Amino acid sequence: MIAQPAKTIDRKLTGEYSWEWTKNELYMKTEEINFVENKILTTNFHTHTTRCNHAVGEDRQYVEAAIKGGLKVLGFSDHSPYFFSGDYYSTFRMKREQVPGYVDSILALKKEYKDDIEIKLGFETEYYPKYFDKLLEFYSQYPIDYIIMGQHFVLNEEEHIYSGDLHHEEDMMMRYVDQVIEGLETGCFTYLAHPDLLNFGGSKENYEKAADELCAYAAKNKVPLEINMLGMREHRHYPNFEFFKIAARHNCDIILGCDAHEPKDVCDLESAKTALEWCRELGLNRIEYPELKKPCRK
């Protein structure tokens, strides 16, 4: 049986959550709660839900964990549905018919926990120019606060060129950057998630040239770049320290994103400490609350 969290939290209580992973479900026992004194990570706009098929935990559990961890603002940004042609089916994003339930759930939690935390409704999505206008039309039905760009594929997803695979083609990094910049030009995206996702095995010169172009654009247009803490805690090829050296030269705005797929990661203080060490070492301009942009054309 899953213990249901109380609707209001008594901040006088002390103790901790206990987490158990059983039969592909995340069980949370809300017993006594120990609120963390957290001054290094007060916002997180990169949070997923089970609707994307690779996250665990109930929406409420993410909110409870965020409050416990000391967050002041929690943004939900699950993987957006997309409108592909033909019979192509994307397995890592919510279905369009799940969106009303997602919206209703987040808005209900926003109202319920308004005295404890600020909750924002968003999506993480790619820029696929062939289908993007149809996606914006779909978004217009809902009170979405923001979307973030996570460019998981180059070109369109049906071509299966996953950005995180190792690419040795010398033009691949620039192809990725060109598509990202074209997407950012729409003015729809609040920030760029894991900007260094493209796993480039070509020449250092071509990597730096493309990264420099992306960072120059981001700096000029005040688009924050995310240090992705999922990549950090899972020891992936990103975040890439060399990429953020280039971002520092352009004085880019930097935001920390937990990229939480489990409630326990919604306030990842250990990774945040490492990310802040990067910011201090490189002189990066870290921001906590970006300007939220509604997903519509300029």
Question: Model-predicted segments: where are they?
Answer:
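Well-ordered, non-membrane alpha-helical segments in soluble/globular domains
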Residues: 99-106, 173-177, 272
